């Protein structure tokens, strides 16, 4: 009689010391667990070997990406429930070592090893990037990291992002608004915060597929230079600019922001790009942007932030994100971002948290992906599509639960006269 699921349920509960909140369906067809809960589908024994070899986030991610694990039921509910039984990120080795001192845990591990069977360990899925020992953030490593994430295929991104082709947090007038409306409102918000006027020069750092460059040129009469490290993004953005008849107003370059030399600019936007800069390079990033602005020019820095830790020296990047999504990416608390911008010479004038907006945005992206799943897997492969579904759904929950946030920081290169040019009443953005 098939019994893998009840055996697995019992061993996991013995290990974690609590009831398993998910239902399990095992490779032999057996099921166990709460009948109304989402079902964790364990397709083969290899899934157990992945989790035993990397007991935590990375092992779970490898099993998911390879298709060894799946969820039958609401993905968001399942991820919330799983979060309570996965080893704490950044604490895997120490937490497991402490847990193994318990005879019950050791007995459960032995039982799981017998159930998993040989061999150990399975090779990581091919979608996993090679992780450097440390985050170098040289021009070459940044270029490779950007290519891993953004050169997946423009057709795939069209499915996920929709017609707006904006890959950053939208700005929602209401939860039931369309994604396209919310993204247009975000682009307009950025332009108003920068107080763009006809003829002014805007540098868009990390310009993506050109949406902000087009909006700023078409709606505000700005002359825009957009820079990206992604060849695919640049080709797509250039075609969009040409189709809009804006080639005299918007230029798209494949260029590192550190190599831009044609300042000064009246304004700089950096939307969802600074997460790739790295903590060690952040002051250099801020200093370079300060150098490129004219006195009185404004910077709008839109960036995801993590929560600060009591001991920052022990902070470790998310293993799944670093291996499968944003190799070499780093988040830092908003306080560190503001400090580094001011160290570079900026005067920070406004910080707006739009955390809930990103949760709404991510849920729409997941819905877009799921609605065209068959074509998405044809375009990029099932493993890569599974990476994206997991990463976006988990990120939506992280924003909803206040584990991470996103902020727009408006800063000014204030002239020696001290006249910032900002309105007396904040957030009128005139």
For each predicted feature, which ranges?
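A short acidic, Gly/Pro-enriched loop at the edge of an enzyme's catalytic core
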Residues: 258-268
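Substrate-binding/catalytic lobe of Class I Rossmann-like enzymes that use SAM or dcSAM, i.e.
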Residues: 304-419, 426-429
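Conserved class I S-adenosyl-L-methionine
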Residues: 197-206
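Conserved SAM-binding loop
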Residues: 237-238
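Conserved SAM-binding loop of SAM-dependent methyltransferases across substrates and taxa
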Residues: 209-220
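A short glycine-rich, Lys/Arg-flanked "PGG" loop and its adjoining helix->strand segment in the class I
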Residues: 283-295
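Conserved beta-strand signature within the Rossmann-like core of class I S-adenosyl-L-methionine
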Residues: 296-304
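Feature captures hydrophobic
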Residues: 1-177, 182-183, 189
């Amino acid at each position: 009689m098939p019994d893998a699921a009840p055996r697995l349920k019992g061993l996991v509960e013995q290990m974690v010391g609590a009831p398993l909140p998910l239902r399990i369906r095992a490779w032999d067809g057996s099921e166990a667990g709460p009948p109304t809960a989402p079902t964790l589908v364990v397709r083969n024994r290899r899934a157990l070997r992945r989790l035993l070899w990397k007991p935590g986030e990375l092992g779970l991610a490898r099993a998911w990406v390879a298709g060894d694990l799946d969820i039958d039921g609401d993905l968001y509910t399942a991820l919330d429930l799983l979060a309570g039984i996965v080893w704490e990120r950044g604490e895997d080795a120490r937490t497991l070592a402490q847990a193994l001192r318990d005879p019950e845990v050791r007995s459960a591990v032995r039982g799981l090893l017998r159930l998993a069977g040989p061999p150990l360990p399975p090779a990581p899925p091919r979608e996993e990037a090679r992780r450097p020992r440390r985050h170098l953030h040289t021009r070459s490593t940044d270029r490779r990291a950007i290519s891993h994430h953004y050169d997946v295929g423009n057709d795939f991104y069209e499915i996920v992002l929709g017609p707006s082709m904006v890959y950053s947090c939208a700005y929602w007038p209401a939860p039931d608004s369309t994604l396209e409306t919310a993204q247009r409102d975000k682009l307009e918000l950025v332009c108003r915060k920068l107080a763009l006027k006809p003829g002014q020069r805007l540098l868009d750092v990390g310009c993506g597929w050109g949406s902000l460059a087009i909006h700023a040129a078409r709606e505000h009469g700005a002359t825009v230079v957009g820079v990206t490290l992604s060849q695919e993004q640049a080709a797509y953005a250039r075609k969009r600019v040409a189709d809009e008849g804006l080639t005299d107003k918007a230029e798209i370059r494949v260029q590192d922001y550190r190599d831009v030399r044609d300042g000064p600019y009246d304004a700089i936007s950096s939307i969802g790009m600074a997460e790739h800069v790295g903590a060690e390079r952040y002051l250099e990033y801020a200093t370079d942007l300060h150098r490129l602005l004219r006195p009185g020019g404004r910077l709008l820095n839109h960036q995801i932030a993590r929560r600060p830790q009591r001991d920052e020296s022990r902070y470790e990047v998310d293993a799944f994100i670093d291996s499968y999504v944003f190799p070499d990416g780093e988040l830092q608390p908003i306080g560190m971002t503001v400090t580094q911008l001011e160290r570079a010479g900026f005067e920070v004038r406004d910080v707006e948290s739009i955390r809930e907006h990103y949760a709404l945005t991510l849920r729409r992206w997941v819905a877009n992906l799921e609605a065209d799943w068959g074509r998405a897997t044809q375009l990029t492969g099932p493993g890569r599509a599974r990476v994206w579904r997991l990463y976006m759904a988990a990120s939506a929950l992280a924003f909803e639960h206040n584990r991470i946030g996103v902020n727009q920081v408006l800063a000014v290169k204030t002239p020696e006269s001290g006249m910032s040019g900002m309105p007396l009443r904040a957030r009128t953005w005139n």
